Amino acid sequence: MAHKRLLSCTASEVKTLTAAELKQAIKASEGRIILAETVVTKAPLIEGVSNAEMMRAFSADMLLLNEYDLSTKFIHSLPAMDAPIAYLKELTGRPMGLNLEPVDPSAEALEDWIDLPEGRRATVENFQAANREGFDFLVLTGNPSTGVSHQAIEATVRLAKQHFKGLVFAGKMHSAGTGEKVVSEAHLLAYMAAGADGVLIPSVGTVPGVREDQVARIADQVKDLGG
């Protein structure tokens, strides 16, 4: 299809976007894209309506599933089915993404870590499974108490770009149970060098010490690198 803003794409057009076309459509929207995340293991806000549908109804442009296990395919309050992601994409008509977590057993533990299920880990098998399920993008990140490190994220970006067909984003919104800085300019730029399509940066003030000048500087550099 011709280059078009994601904001202007119909559901039928979104369905046909390649990874490169999706990235271009996001860029063409000039910072106006809203990505909304939902924890699929929790009950929906309204019985009978998935949170993905709710987010789309309130104008989310991209949808991100957190705690989705590729082994069980469980989504709270959704009927059991073989292809829940295809079903949600049909209901919403939006690009659908997934959080996967690069656990680092050697990282400094700030707290006790949870035993993360295999279906939520950032592995080659799960990248391939995400392809089969039709996810449009991955976010390599860490939930609380999971033991995800910047070093593990960087290594996994390279792996994901080899085995996943969609876009790959990377970064941390909190420590994920490790003793390292949440926002590291060097690591965020290293993700881009490793092939990431974009990075996660906490909004100013949402994480202690995250400042406007710091975020602006990183954002400018990431954009210069194609993110």
Regions found by a protein language model. Name each.
Residues 37-38, 97-101, 141, 171-172:
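Short beta-strand segments
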Residues 46-72, 77, 109-226:
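Alpha/beta enzyme core
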Residues 33, 95-97, 166-169, 227:
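Proline-centered loop/turn at the N-terminus of a beta-strand
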Residues 39-43:
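Short, glycine-rich nucleotide/cofactor-binding loops
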Residues 105-106:
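Glycine/small-residue-rich loop that forms an oxyanion/phosphate-binding "nest" at active or ligand-binding sites
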Residues 1-37, 82-99:
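N-terminal amphipathic alpha-helix/helix-capping segment at the start of soluble metabolic enzymes
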Residues 68, 83-102, 113, 117-125:
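A generic, well-ordered mixed alpha/beta core segment in the N-terminal half of proteins
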